[in-house]
């Protein structure tokens, strides 16, 4: 999707996503954005566990890699939830919806503003009828 700055009441919610390039022959040209997260996760798995006491793994202290992986997974989960929240909400406009006098482009105005036009037509019709008569 493209940015909607040309719209009258503001910008859409969310950022523009860049497509991820997929190469059939492996990881030749992986995008620089997606690579470090996966690479760091693999490094964290390959790294040997630090020596611990006989009581087993210390539950209070999580390694930095574990924290990073947890945060990344959490962010992905919340973004997936937001997509399927329910019915589509109109968030394109800055204040929820345009002001009433700005809606419909102003062509549905009150009847009062049309009365001079009606009078003008009546006068024109009467004049034409008068000219045809004489």
Curated annotation (Swiss-Prot):
Q: Which residue positions does N-acetylserine occur at?
A: 1
Entry keyword Phosphoprotein: yes
Positions bearing Phosphoserine: 31
- Residue ranges, annotated region (Disordered): 43-107
Sorted keywords for this record are: Acetylation, Amidation, Cleavage on pair of basic residues, Endorphin, Hormone, Phosphoprotein, Secreted
* UniProt organism field: Loxodonta africana
Q: Show the GO MF annotations.
A: G protein-coupled receptor binding; hormone activity
Q: Which Pfam families match?
A: ACTH_domain, Op_neuropeptide
Cite the InterPro entries for this sequence.
Answer: Mcrtin_ACTH_cent (IPR013531), Opioid_neuropept (IPR013532), PMOC (IPR001941), POMC-derived_peptides (IPR050878)
Q: Name one GO cellular component term.
A: extracellular space
- What superkingdom heads the lineage? Eukaryota
Kindly give the SMART domains that the UniProt entry links to this protein.
Answer: ACTH_domain, Op_neuropeptide
Q: Does the keyword Phosphoprotein apply?
A: yes
Ranges of biased composition (kind: Basic and acidic residues): 43-52, 79-104
Q: What family is this protein classified in?
A: Belongs to the POMC family.
Q: Where in the cell is it found?
A: Secreted
What GO terms describe the biological role, i.e. biological process, of this protein? neuropeptide signaling pathway; regulation of corticosterone secretion
Q: What is this protein called?
A: Pro-opiomelanocortin
User: Which tissues does it occur in?
Assistant: ACTH and MSH are produced by the pituitary gland.
Instruction: Provide the primary localization.
Output: secreted
Which residues are recorded as modified (Valine amide)? 13
